[in-house]
């Protein structure tokens, strides 16, 4: 491993046995340098002198170690590495879920879930995660799999809704000292269960709202869609955020089950006839521009899901057991975190970013290949035959 990556790897201080620590290291490096589908065999073959794939299976499915301990130590490593922030620095905690599409019908806890488009259903697993963003820095925080109620009943496991899992992630979040936390989520999570958790932690929130969300005006009830139809779009003020222009109407409304809330009705300035997007927040004094700027940060969790799936094999697992699946997700989040920590540290500052995650993976892959060449040359100089070298390094002859 490169020195900076190894430094953070050792700083995790997980209470592993010596064999477990070795398998943990293989899983981390394999997740990063593997160019194929991230099966256990592919992870094992991607790392020099890693041993057999069955060792990785025993590590992820059978070996006794704590997932919660790994998650806590991973986040504590992030907190220990981050700089001290000025009082009131904004810290965004993003809540969302993502589906890991699968084809194996015998995988534990797999089921049909509604896709991101809200129409198409996908078979697989659904995970709810929290993601922390401070300026240019971002790290995954927590992960909780959502299991269907039927499966929970069959396995005598306690069932939690996605909203309850999101509330747990919010309650468990340990932010850096002195920051002001704003929780960002989409319309699915705009409900009393999640909002209660936000209020308990004395955080603030910004969310997208559904068009049928009801608000009270005096004794009358109306929904946001009806409000939008009454607006004169051509005379709304234009707000520019991140290179895009919006026509925005903002006001304070009493939303059903939420109380007094700042609401934004936003139209695409280039295509004002398109359906509006509704945003809501408990920070009633924020300007429309601030609300829009803050909510655009939520997109960072979408790019996070893309990166961990495309680069680190987050959804490539083939293990049938739910325990192994949950451990795989935690291990991938740890690999992502180590990459992020290496990325900022090698920049010489935690506010700069020298490489993309894809470039980091390619760089570590090159380092792995250079180490392989070094070992081949070393064994060749000792007089070993090509066949012997291939056997010892588990290479195709």
Language model features with spans:
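Alpha-helix C-cap/termination motif
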Residues: 34, 46, 85, 176, ...
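Generic alpha-helix structural propensity
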Residues: 23, 35-39, 51-55, 65, ...
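Active-site-proximal, Lys/Arg-enriched surface segment
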Residues: 62-141, 147-149, 245-251
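A generic secondary-structure signal
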Residues: 46, 77-81, 168-176
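Single, function-defining residue in the core of a domain
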Residues: 1-12, 16, 20, 26, ...
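Short secondary-structure transition/capping motifs
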Residues: 32, 45, 62-67, 115, ...
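Gly/serine-rich nucleotide phosphate-binding loop at the start of the catalytic core
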Residues: 1-68
């Amino acid at each position: 491993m490169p020195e900076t990556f190894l430094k953070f790897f050792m700083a995790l201080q997980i209470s592993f046995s010596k064999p477990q620590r070795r398998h943990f290291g293989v899983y981390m490096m394999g997740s990063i340098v593997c160019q194929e589908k991230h099966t256990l065999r592919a992870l094992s073959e991607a790392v020099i002198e890693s041993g057999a794939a069955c060792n990785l299976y025993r590590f992820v499915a059978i070996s006794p170690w704590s997932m919660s301990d790994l998650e806590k130590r991973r986040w504590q490593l992030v907190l220990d590495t981050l700089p001290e922030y000025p009082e009131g620095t904004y810290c965004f905690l993003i809540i969302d879920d993502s589906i890991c599409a699968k084809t194996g019908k015998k995988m534990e806890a797999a089921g049909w879930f509604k896709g991101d488009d809200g129409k198409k259903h996908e078979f697989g697993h659904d995970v709810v995660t929290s993601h922390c963003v401070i300026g240019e820095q971002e790290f995954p925080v927590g992960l909780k799999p959502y299991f269907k109620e039927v499966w929970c009943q069959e396995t005598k496991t306690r069932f939690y809704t996605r909203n309850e899992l999101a509330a747990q992630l919010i309650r468990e979040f340990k932010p850096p000292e002195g920051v002001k936390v704003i929780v960002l989520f989409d319309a699915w999570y705009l409900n009393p269960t999640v909002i209660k958790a936000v209020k308990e932690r004395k955080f603030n929130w910004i969310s997208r709202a559904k068009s049928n969300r009801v608000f009270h005006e005096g004794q009358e009830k109306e929904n946001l869609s009806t409000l939008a139809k009454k607006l004169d779009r051509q005379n709304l003020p234009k707000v520019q955020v991140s290179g895009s222009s919006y026509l925005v109407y903002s006001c304070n409304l009493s939303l059903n089950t939420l109380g007094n809330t700042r609401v934004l009705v936003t139209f695409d300035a280039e295509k004002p006839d398109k359906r509006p997007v509704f945003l809501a927040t408990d920070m009633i004094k924020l300007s429309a521009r601030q609300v829009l700027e803050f909510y655009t940060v939520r997109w960072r969790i979408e790019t996070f899901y893309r990166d961990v799936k495309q680069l680190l094999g987050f959804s490539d697992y083939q293990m049938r057991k739910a325990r192994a699946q949950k451990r795989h997700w935690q291990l991938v989040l740890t690999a992502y975190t180590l990459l992020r920590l290496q990325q900022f540290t090698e920049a010489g500052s935690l506010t700069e970013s020298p490489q993309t995650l894809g470039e980091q993976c390619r760089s570590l892959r090159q380092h792995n290949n250079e180490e392989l060449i070094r070992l081949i040359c070393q064994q060749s100089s000792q007089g070993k035959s090509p066949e012997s070298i291939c056997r010892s390094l588990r290479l195709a002859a």
